[in-house]
Amino acid sequence: FKMGDSVCIMRDGKVVQTGTPEELSMQPANDYVRDFIQTADKTEVMSVKNIMITPSRIVRLGDSIDRAIQEMSRNNLSSVIVIDSALRPKGMLFIGEAIQARKEGKAIAQVLQTGINTIAEDTLVSDVITIATESSYPIAVTDTGGAMLGLVTKASILSTLS
């Protein structure tokens, strides 16, 4: 599958399916194609846009600490991803640090855990595995302008491998 952008699978001299390796992997035309694809490493043909998840809650950089704490408490979350006004991921905010920041009168930007990794939506899953294993945070999937589209977690990668 690494040999071309488009793949044609034939059986008995007839075209069964044509498409990108990712299309064949995600939408095999029939059992023949499915069996053929079965031997391929899905992480080598599948992009992260197919495994990313939508975060249950996000907080904006300009939001108040109180609002961030309310979002996390109301949704039983220990952390949230923080984005700026252009939807670019800026980092993670943890409930304990947010509560401490409220006591000290600090803003989200002052207690935000930066260093969140970002990847493009067309990045292959195989290229993200090492990043995910070395990161304490989910990986933000972004568009060409840097706006967040979703997250890749260790769990979403593991479900692809199974």
For every predicted segment, state its role.
Residues 44-58, 94, 104-116, 123:
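Bateman (tandem CBS) regulatory domains
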Residues 58-77, 82-86, 99-102, 117-145, ...:
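The conserved cystathionine-beta-synthase
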Residues 6-9, 13, 24:
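Conserved short hydrophobic beta-strand within the ABC ATPase nucleotide-binding domain
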